[in-house]
């Protein structure tokens, strides 16, 4: 009898999970950022709260950019931009939505990002350019937690640094008409910032758009980021 109850309970939980997935908003489609983001700012338009050491590094990056020197930026060597920078670039991305997994496929080098739904975020993972991401539905919003980032990428196109302690939380909210997507991101990195902070971005859906092939190695000379 206990075994039967356990089986029925598991089946019920599975059905609830499937029903939740079925009721989740459909984020599928190709998305373009609505407004170009250069320097990432907090939601109130301020410079993020950098530590003294990180501020010095940020200033060094901005000085180099002013001189036309982008050699510090791995993107100029065809390395992946990292997050959340990849979400701030003008090139579009496509969301492929499945019951247990979401995929972000970016035009830039066709970079794929996998978000595992309803899984725990590992505390010890090998570093990746796009980190390791898990997600869950909070009512009609998709909440994504990511860690395990390479520390050689940047947070934006203006040289904002981060460390391997970066923890990124993203909250995606779809508009009622399904054509606009709002992203609220929280950046927590105690090695780089004195406190966690939030930023935001908006995206517009482009029905019928097919993302073209994009291979960085085909660029004759990559001396500076495309954005």
Q: Across the structure, where does each feature detected by a protein language model lie?
A:
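Hydrophobic small-molecule pocket/channel-lining residues, especially in calycin-type beta-barrels
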Residues: 20-227
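Bacterial N-terminal signal peptides
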Residues: 7-19
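Short helix-onset patch at the extreme N-terminus, typifying the N->h transition
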Residues: 6-8, 29-30
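Positively charged n-region of N-terminal signal peptides that target proteins for export
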Residues: 1-5
């Amino acid at each position: 009898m206990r075994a039967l109850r356990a089986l029925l309970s598991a089946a019920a939980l599975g059905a609830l999970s499937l029903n939740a997935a079925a009721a989740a908003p459909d984020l599928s489609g190709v998305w373009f950022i609505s407004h170009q983001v250069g320097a990432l700012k907090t939601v109130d338009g301020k410079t993020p709260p950098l530590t003294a050491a990180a501020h010095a590094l940020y200033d060094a990056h901005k000085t180099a950019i002013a001189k036309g020197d982008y050699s510090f930026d791995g993107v100029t060597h065809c390395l992946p931009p990292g997050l959340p920078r990849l979400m701030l670039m003008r090139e579009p991305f496509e969301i492929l939505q499945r019951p247990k997994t979401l995929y972000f496929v970016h035009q830039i080098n066709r970079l794929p990002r996998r978000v595992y739904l309803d899984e725990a975020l590992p505390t010890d993972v090998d570093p990746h350019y796009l980190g390791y991401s898990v997600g869950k539905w909070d009512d009609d919003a998709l909440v994504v937690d990511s860690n395990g980032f390479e520390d050689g990428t940047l947070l934006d196109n203006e040289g904002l640094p981060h460390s391997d302690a970066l923890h990124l939380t993203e909250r995606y909210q779809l508009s009622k008409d399904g054509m606009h997507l709002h992203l609220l991101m929280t950046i927590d990195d105690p090695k780089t910032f004195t406190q966690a902070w939030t930023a935001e971005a908006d995206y517009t859906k482009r029905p019928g758009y097919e993302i073209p092939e994009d291979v960085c190695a085909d660029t004759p000379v990559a001396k500076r980021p495309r954005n």
